Regions:
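Signature of the SF2 helicase/ATPase Hel1-core->accessory helical subdomain module
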Residues: 205-219, 227-348
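Walker A/P-loop
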Residues: 47-66
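N-terminal pre-P-loop "Q-motif" helix
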Residues: 25-41
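Conserved small/polar residues in nucleotide/adenosyl-binding loops
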Residues: 353-360
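Hydrophobic "anchor" residues on beta-strands that sit immediately upstream
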Residues: 51, 80, 222, 248-249
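Walker A/P-loop NTP-binding motif
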Residues: 64-77, 100
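A substrate-engagement module of RecA-like helicase motors
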Residues: 2-18, 25, 47, 77-221, ...
Length: 360
């Protein structure tokens, strides 16, 4: 519930905004937005989730409204405030303008940090591997793990400059802080990635730009990110951001969120490709039947082909818009659900009959 102290902090922040923001104009819609956000986050509405969707026209002062209300509440609940924008332009505006203003008028002290994806930071180990001891030797060029082709002189100069800048602490390690960023193909060779990262086991861990940035974010009250980073981080198990239970999320320009969520949380497959692949396996299936003297595999393959055709026919009758069909909120039709369950069982049965036994 909203305590008297919290209400006073929100009012004080709002009063501060009136004096600190130039050309401030009091709007009733902005006042209502502050009130509704505050009541929702503090569970003033019983039996509802603390989620609110706010739609307001340009010029309402939405950013100021959610900062005035959310900053004191996040501090009170001991949670991180994660502000996710839809694009880089808005992210920079929030970072360089809105948050800076909020530091002046907010009734609570807070620290903020910008969160970026791991690939925006250099991996020191990779950078050193590509620049160490190759000034008079061509051995490194032959190492396919480091180079798929001989690097150009310009590539090497870029790498040496980055290594020197990082060593002298004149470069933060973020690609966005470079005056002349390298080509993407070169950057990918030295960028951080979760597949090769040794984390605390790496000898350069204490000097790692990515982990230093993550440490700064973990010590901050407000984290400025973007939709893609938040969604990707949820999928990857909170490698960059704190656990979702420890955060209050603000999705600015949330009308972009549904499309971004679809791209992150969906996977695809072609029924026609599956049917073609199954037909191409026919020769191998015939060999298996000869060896095992069992027609069970062929029977399962035929059932898979039939189920895929039935699924394809059903899907082709749906009314797609721009190659997308969104099912109603009540769920996927039983016909599709039953067919996919049937295919799952059939595929597993095929694997059972075609996989070698432990005794083979």
């Amino acid at each position: 519930m909203l305590t008297p102290k919290l209400k006073q902090q929100i009012r004080s922040s709002f009063d501060g905004a009136k004096t600190q923001i130039s050309n401030f104009s009091n709007r009733s819609s902005q006042n209502k937005m502050i009130a509704e956000i505050s009541k929702t986050l503090m569970s003033e509405y019983p039996d509802t989730n603390p989620i609110i969707c706010v739609e307001a026209p340009t010029g309402t002062g939405k950013t100021m409204a959610y900062l005035v209300s959310c900053l004191p509440i996040a501090k009170s609940l001991k949670k991180k405030l994660v502000i996710a924008s839809a694009n880089v332009a808005l992210q920079e505006q929030i970072l360089n303008k809105d948050i800076v203003e909020a530091k002046k008028y907010s009734s609570v002290d807070f620290e903020f940090a910008l969160a970026k994806g791991r690939s925006r930071y250099v991996c020191i180990r990779n950078l050193i591997n590509l620049t160490e001891d190759n000034s008079s030797s061509t051995t490194l060029f032959e190492d396919a793990l480091l180079w798929d082709e001989k690097p150009t002189k310009n590539d090497l100069n870029n790498l040496y400059e980055m290594a020197e800048s990082y060593s002298s602490k004149s470069w933060s390690g973020e690609i966005d802080d470079l005056e002349s960023p390298p080509e993407n193909s070169l950057w990918q060779k030295i960028a951080c990635n979760r597949f090769t990262c040794n984390a605390k086991n790496c000898e350069f861990y204490n000097d790692c730009s990515f982990f230093n940035a993550r440490k700064k974010a973990s010590n901050s009250d407000v984290i400025i990110a973007n939709h893609d980073l938040v969604l990707a981080d949820i999928i990857n198990g909170n490698n960059v951001l704190p656990d979702v239970e420890e955060c209050i999320f603000i999705f600015d320009e949330a009308h972009h969120l549904s499309q971004k969520a679809l791209s992150h949380f969906s996977s695809g497959g072609s029924t026609e490709f599956m049917r073609t692949s199954i037909r191409q396996c026919q020769g191998s299936i015939d060999q298996i039947i000869k060896i095992t003297k069992s027609t069970a595999t062929k029977s399962y393959i035929e059932k898979v082909d039939e189920a895929l055709k039935e699924l394809t026919d059903f899907i082709s009758e749906l009314e797609f818009s721009d190659d997308i069909y969104l099912f109603p909120i009540d769920g996927i039709p039983n016909e599709i659900t039953n067919l996919t369950k049937q295919l799952f069982v059939l595929f597993n049965s095929c694997l059972l009959y075609t996989s070698p036994s432990p005794r083979d």
